[in-house]
């Protein structure tokens, strides 16, 4: 089953996540089909905290991808900010 979830990046004590579409059986940071955005939980000042490609997310959801709990919250936040 396809899932949209966070893949950890960044460095020590500076987490950074990529929103990726992947098979649910793959490891968290393993191979993925597509990267559809990013999330920076410790963004400061003018840094972008959340960026989501809404068109691609809509496509993947239409073909059956399921978002993780945290990604669902982030997508809701992103849609609210875009409106």
From Swiss-Prot:
Signal peptide range: none
Coiled coil: none
Pfam families (alphabetical): Ribosomal_S16
MF (Gene Ontology): structural constituent of ribosome
Keywords: Ribonucleoprotein, Ribosomal protein
Domain of life: Bacteria
Gene Ontology cellular-component annotations: cytoplasm; small ribosomal subunit
GO biological process, one term: translation
Similarity remark: Belongs to the bacterial ribosomal protein bS16 family.
Protein's recorded name: Small ribosomal subunit protein bS16
Organism: Pseudomonas fluorescens (strain ATCC BAA-477 / NRRL B-23932 / Pf-5)
GN (gene name): rpsP
